Amino acid sequence: MTRTVPRRTFLGLAAAATLVPAQTQTNQEKGREIAQKTIYALGGDGFRFMKTRTESGKAYSFYHDQITGLSPAHIYTTYLPEGAPIRQQQRQNFGKKFDDAVILTASSAWEVTFRGAKPLGDERLKTFIETTLHDIFYILRCRMEEPDLTFEYRGKDVVENSPVETLDIFDSDNRKTTVWIHSTTFLPVKQSFQRWDPAISDRREEVTRYTKYREAGNGVLWPHDTQRERDQSKVFELYADKVTVGDDFKPGLFDLPAGVTVLKK
């Protein structure tokens, strides 16, 4: 026999149910959830497992917000397996013939020209490593499984005229990266971190803005306009005409050319 619940009792039960608080997320849980949504927006497994990336376009350098240099640029990035101290290597080729290069790895930083190969020094290497470890795309691609990596949700905001979700990302070495994620597309809009600069014995704020996301292959979306600021002054912009992922790089691309002359610092 089916029992009918009187209307008043039913309404009372429904009202009581609304008084039971829903289980709320912690700021860390919500922060990591947004990070996972960002990975999905960037291409999901296509993003997580991409092995190489090529960005081709124009690189601009600035001083006091004024353009001081413009060059065609090809930037090659490869990702290394787990266990490497830094799971990313990069070669930046500049010039009309792309014969000027900067090679950056976990252990060395070189400038290669027709004169030879010049070591860029320890500070340039440290800057590359710190910039990489703070980079939101590198964090999402290579660092998500680190046990002490935490995402703290800081609330909603408006950045670049876009609604965003603000996250603070912390690692076990007390690095902090703040990133602003678009509330609708879940693509990174802006990031900021601070690093110590021994040249001025003070901290510098490094800000990067990302726009013009386009398909790069295998379902991956990548920004075609990347702008960097240091202490509120624009210092660099890469405007890519084309970005591709999954290219097969020739062997030795991230090594010094055989027989190259090694110059003094």
Predicted feature residues:
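Extracytoplasmic/lumenal soluble domains of exported proteins with redox or metal-associated functions
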Residues: 28-64, 88, 134-137, 157, ...
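N-terminal secretory signal peptides and thylakoid transit peptides that target proteins
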Residues: 1-17
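Flexible, processing/modification-adjacent segments and terminal tails
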Residues: 26-33, 106-175, 185, 195-202, ...
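N-terminal mature ectodomain segment of secretory-pathway/periplasmic proteins
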Residues: 36-117, 148-152
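Boundary at the C-terminal end of the N-terminal hydrophobic targeting segment
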Residues: 22-24
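Short, surface-exposed linear segments at secondary-structure transitions and domain or protein termini
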Residues: 10, 82-87, 108-113, 130-132, ...
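Catalytic loop of the DD-peptidase/beta-lactamase superfamily, centered on the K-T-G motif
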Residues: 98-107, 117-118, 126-129, 229-262
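Gly/Pro-enriched, hydrophobic low-complexity segments
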Residues: 160-256
